[in-house]
Regions:
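Basic/aromatic-rich interaction segments and small domains that mediate binding to polyanionic partners
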Residues: 23-51
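Intrinsically disordered, low-complexity, charged/polar segments
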Residues: 46-64
């Protein structure tokens, strides 16, 4: 997704791949865009701490 298409207050699907104990895993979660910064954007999810994604992570991991 292009950072220029982000809208503050809107929810986006964050799709991420990671490795846990040597096993590749995929996870998805809905994040709300709180603010857009020069280097990326800040998102929140329910009661979790704010999540910062850089421009590359936004391009590769976010979906509408």
């Amino acid at each position: 997704m292009d950072k220029n298409n982000l809208t503050t207050g809107r929810k986006y699907l964050h799709h991420r791949r990671t490795v846990i104990d040597g096993i590749p895993r995929e996870a998805e979660r809905w994040l709300r865009c709180e603010r857009i910064t020069d280097t990326g954007a800040v998102f929140s999810r329910d009661y979790e701490a704010e999540i910062t994604l850089n421009d590359q992570q936004i391009r590769e991991e976010l979906r509408e």
